[in-house]
Amino acid sequence: MNPETFIEKYAAALATQDWQQVDPLVHPDACVTFSSGAVHVGQTAVRQAFERNFSLIQDERYAIENVHWVMQGEDTAVYLFTFHWSGIINGKPTSGAGTGSSVLINSENGWQLLVEHLGPKTG
């Protein structure tokens, strides 16, 4: 797997709303910041945050677009992106979008998410 393939697998795994699909793609030391400003450090905290979102948002659709590679090396890759999501929350259609930045690390388990920072949509 290369960093580009990682993004495809990550988006597909998130779309399943099943942590078991996402887990192999998240580094044990991962740190994820949601657009709300909530910071989740470590794979356990990240898992709990994602599972909370999975249970809150039904039939979620998630897309990563406009990927811009800041750098790609043999062991590290950094990219910027936009994201869009939609789903049902409390019986009502809901959606959102924003920007993000991610750091990937090529570990003994292949490419994994080390840092993800999601922010509000700009411009």
Residue map of PLM features:
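A beta-strand edge to alpha-helix "cap/lid" segment located at domain peripheries
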Residues: M1-Q21, C31-G123
